[in-house]
Design a protein with these regions (language model features):
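N-terminal targeting/assembly segments of extracytoplasmic apparatus and virion spike/baseplate proteins
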Residues: 1-228
Length: 228
């Protein structure tokens, strides 16, 4: 097995009746990422050959059921960083949400309005909703955020509430945000909101689905000033 990081991460593998557990161990060592195997996969013998495939297509050839947990740094142009790879048995179900993505704290959104999710019935109600300073909706894997002079932590907490995921506010900077973002993937939305967000995602390669697991508003990186 060879793993190259340049120009982009790519994997080559030639295995002839190799134990899947040994292939997974080698992959984990090369990628420096934990790899988890389903019980039935441990002693399975595999024969695979491919060259210079990017991560996800390579993983799909290695297992019928694959999940990958990623960390996305919105301030970086680097591709999402894999945190854990799961080669599971067909009927094993999904890994626990906290298998590799864990957090010590969670911030909560406290609101007075309990009518979220109720469609406005009249034109007046629709107009009232449209005039609200912060609106977040998530439909068909697309996120919409409309914010008028709203603090960034509040926007992220509202996104977390809509997605049903924990949000960790570590940066108390109350930067005020105006946003008009319609029907984009979660990753694209948070990239537009701030460079200090860490988004944790899970890719289900079998079903070609991606979902958010956790949002963190991190402290901005400390920049060291160079003397002229």
């Amino acid at each position: 097995m060879t793993v190259k990081a340049r120009p982009i991460l790519n994997i080559s593998l030639k295995a002839e009746k190799a134990k899947m557990s040994e292939v997974a161990q080698e992959l984990s060592k090369r990628l420096k990422v934990p790899v988890f195997l389903g019980p039935q996969r441990q002693n399975e013998l595999v024969s695979i050959e491919f060259s210079e495939l990017t991560l996800e297509p390579a993983l799909q050839l290695m297992s019928p059921t694959v999940y990958v947990d990623y960390e996305i740094d919105t301030g970086s142009t680097a591709p999402p960083k894999p945190l854990g790879i799961f080669f599971f048995d067909v009927n094993q179900g999904e890994p626990p949400v906290t298998a590799v993505v864990t957090g010590s704290s969670q911030s909560l959104l406290v609101e007075g309005n309990t009518e979220d999710g109720v469609e406005p019935a009249t034109e007046d109600e629709k107009k009232k909703v449209e005039e609200e300073p912060l609106r977040v909706s998530y439909k068909n894997s697309a996120l919409t955020v409309k914010a008028k002079k709203q603090p960034l932590p509040l926007i992220l907490l509202k996104i977390g509430e809509e997605l049903g995921i924990p949000v960790d506010i570590r940066n108390e900077n109350r930067s005020i945000v105006d946003a008009e973002i319609s029907k984009l993937p979660v990753e694209d939305v948070v990239r537009q909101l701030s460079p200090n967000i860490r988004l944790f995602m899970r890719a289900d390669l079998t079903r070609a689905e991606r979902r958010a697991l956790r949002l963190v508003l991190a402290e901005p990186p400390i920049t060291t000033q160079q003397n002229p």
